[in-house]
Regions:
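Low-complexity, acidic/polar, glycine-enriched regions of mature
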Residues: 1-177
């Protein structure tokens, strides 16, 4: 039985430079994922996840509405983005890499996450047989690879939003007995 993401104790975050001056932080409020963990052979493990793109939130409603538009995430035509691992490893202590395919707006690109294993809690108090395991995964993607567009502002001669976007997934997985 696979491990499932606990959405109440997990986060999908992103960080992007705005006018090269400040960093805008955002998150997706609704997502799910599974981890098929092979404890004897971790390289044989796999992970996949789905994010509801319409749940994007930067804390500023007009910006969030803009991010949902056709030339950005186009949430009407592409309500989800997905990630599916293709390979896991190499391992160095509690750190490893997850190689996989990220699909945004129907465009699939290979993406590698650098992952830190934060540990396991077993058994979970008051829940006999339940286990929790936490990971923090980081990557950087180029928004142009997924046709997420911004237009240059002629008056300042630059693009307001950087091409590179840092993604951080802080995940707690639960395994039921």
């Amino acid at each position: 039985m696979p491990w499932k993401v606990d959405p109440d104790n997990s986060e999908v975050l992103f960080f992007v430079k705005h006018f090269r001056l400040t960093t805008v932080r955002g998150r997706f409020k609704k997502f799910e994922g599974t981890l098929d963990m092979n404890e004897e052979n971790p390289q044989a493990s796999s992970v996949e996840g789905t994010v509801e793109t319409a749940t994007i939130s930067t804390g500023i409603a007009p910006r969030d509405m803009d991010l949902r538009r056709r030339n950005r995430f186009n949430v009407r035509d592409f309500p989800q983005m997905t990630y599916k691992s293709t390979r896991i490893g190499p391992f160095e202590g509690n750190r490893f890499q997850v190689f996989g395919d990220l699909t945004i707006k129907g465009i699939t690109r290979p993406v590698v996450f650098d992952v830190e294993d934060k540990g396991e809690l077993s058994p979970v108090k008051g829940m006999p047989g339940w286990r929790r395991h936490a990971f923090e995964a980081r990557t950087r993607v180029n928004r142009k690879d997924f046709d997420i567009k911004w237009f240059p502002l002629a008056e300042i001669g630059s693009i307001p939003v950087a091409e590179d976007i840092d993604v951080v997934c802080k995940m707690q997985f639960i395994k039921e007995p």
